[in-house]
Amino acid sequence: MLFYYSILLTYFLKIAFDFNFVVYILSSFGVFLLLKHFLLPFFDVEISTILDALFSLETSENTCYIVSCLTFEEEIDIPTILIKLRQNIAKFPQFNKMKKHFNMKFGVCYWTKSSNFTLENHFEVINTVFENDEALYEFMAKHVNEIKFPKNIPKWKLFLLKNLPGNKSAFVMKISHGMVDGISLMNFLMTVGESKE
């Protein structure tokens, strides 16, 4: 890994004729190495990837969330769903971020494990009777999209809708795009909702 850092450093030195730029790059590189290898592991955090940082940085005007809906032909057993959620979050490394929240300090973006994480805070059963698909879309547009997450908790919530037309049920999930992409989110929801057969 240090080999790649040295190549990158050499490249910057070749293109930089300004001494101040070279000093800036060397000092930034040193701070990055210090943070990544010595300080951040001590505080149980991990540096985010560039894509995580791109999709996780948000302002009041700019948020990047995925809202997904998956319907089922039968009623879903809630205790079984909670067990599967716990298993999947623990089993698959890519979903480990669901227990972390995103931070940025000194220009470094990183994930911090939430000290107060409980699955029950991210799971809500909705007992509202949905007369048709339009009522479901309205729930997603008005209720789910309007949720604001505090900065110190993982930015996701899963809703279980029990009373859809035809005795169907559904998952509706809102999650930060920095945690998952659309395909991995659908895979996650399908493994949580798969039947025993």
Enumerate the predicted regions with their spans:
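Non-catalytic N-terminal regions of enzymes
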Residues: 1-197
